[in-house]
Amino acid sequence: MPYKISRAAYAGMFGPTTGDKVRLADTELFIEIEKDFTTYGEEVKFGGGKVIRDGMGQSQVTRADGAVDTVITNAVIVDHSGIYKADIGLKDGRIVAIGKAGNPDMQPGVNIIVGPGTEAIAAEGKIVTAGGMDSHIHFIAPQQIEEALMSGMTCMLGGGTGPAHGTLATTCTPGPWHLARMIEAADAFPMNLAFAGKGNASLPGALTEMVLAGATSLKLHEDWGTTPGAIDCCLSVADEYDVQVMIHTDTLNESGFVEDTIGAIKGRTIHAFHTEGAGGGHAPDIIKICGQPNVIPSSTNPTRPYTVNTIAEHLDMLMVCHHLSPSIPEDIAFAESRIRKETIAAEDILHDIGAFSIISSDSQAMGRVGEVAIRTWQTADKMKRQRGRLKEEKGDNDNFRVRRYIAKYTINPAIAHGLSREIGSVEVGKRADLVLWNPAFFGVKPDMVLLGGSIAAAPMGDPNASIPTPQPVHYRPMFASYGKSLTNSSVTFVSQASLDAGLKGRLGVAKELVAVKNTRGGISKASMIHNDLTPEIEVDPETYEVRANGELLACEPATVLPMAQRYFLF
């Protein structure tokens, strides 16, 4: 007769199972395990007296005959596709199986073979997510990359050359020479990286040479002049070479209004940065474009979520980031035109209903590179407290809301930028860029970050201690952050045209160069998983009130947030 144990005892030994609920950090978000792919009584667990031992849960199968390189045991997987429990098998830096691990000679239903050559990562009671993607990076300081990695990001896309004033304001790596230097620099960092060229030009020649030099995308920024002519030219080049276009529109409405920008886009796919407008864009109604079926709208994290401090901090940020002077009245007026509490409040709600598709950082240029996940979950928590359960929820949990919000910094930016065949979800065949979390620290401080199946970062105690846990415990680079393991564990994304033109041989870089694919007509707002709503947006030009399909979008600023000072005492 089978042995029975209580749910609490089972969760303590093997982690939660079907029907169990888990609180995410100190939020009001609760997930429920939808399905458990492990087998009761046949679970694999590593340790003294446990299951993964020779002749028990560990088989005699060689790597060549199918044993995996690494098994992650009893993980709660939180993904856009669902919330479930399973073992995860990794091989050659990719996810090769999700399901039941063990020894097929002794155990039934095994699809992940554990052999003598298999390493074990114990995920009992832990959450596993796909590594995050931050799609709005100003490459101002290389130290951003370590900060992002330690927060659970494994891919960064953007532009820049360092603390040049063009980079301080705009996410562009301008020209083939600068792109070459940045792609060369990418070899030094444990992070998947992708670079955007400058998209502001009225003739295609200079844009084409940037795509051929490795740009994965082109960025239109108002500080370089986002005119209708530049928009049309940039999108035409992008359509020819299959790269994405990101746009920061004309705050001052000098070369046209939001309707003129929509007209210049001509129904072509485009990623609209900080679509609410505090980060820049047609004042006061750039937010209207989130209702366009060809526009993929995103937020940057300083306005996530709307709090009592949001408005006050933005003016100074704007003055610094956009090279403005407090002694010039026009510069002050420019800055003030972008900060509107009504549109920021509406942004919260538009995220919650799935009309805004992506959250990113805007690193060091009105954005905090280490807080993409934190700000995403703070927004989700604020919306649950203020708006209650989503109508799509089934059962007494927040599973759908959690799936909607995690998609905003994993699968959706990957789809938008042509990377989703490689990254963005916990899925067989994709890169094993994975993050382990203690549920109490979910979204705030990872337990472990894997790049290409190797451990790149983790909190670690005193290296001279007799065990790994004594203080001081802080985040440290792990072995995938060093030597050839670094360049073999992460990649640099480039355009297909640049690969065809011999970019890798020309630069002699060590990292694999991987082409982006399907960034143009094959995707649209409808491709944004759980975040594809296209409401008709109206903005009152006098009061700045925002309506979606006639409904006023208004909410109060938060006075207290989860995932904040409780986690950062020092």
From Swiss-Prot:
Keywords: Cytoplasm, Hydrolase, Metal-binding, Nickel. The lineage of its organism: Bacteria, Pseudomonadati, Pseudomonadota, Alphaproteobacteria, Hyphomicrobiales. It holds the Pfam family Amidohydro_1. Its main location: cytoplasm. It is found in: Cytoplasm. One of its GO terms (cellular component) is cytoplasm. It comes from Rhizobium johnstonii (strain DSM 114642 / LMG 32736 / 3841). Its EC number is 3.5.1.5. Heterotrimer of UreA (gamma), UreB (beta) and UreC (alpha) subunits. Three heterotrimers associate to form the active enzyme. This is Urease subunit alpha. GO terms for biological process: urea catabolic process. Residues 131-570 form the Urease domain. It is an enzyme of class 3 (hydrolase). Ni(2+) 1 binds at H136, H138, K219, D362.
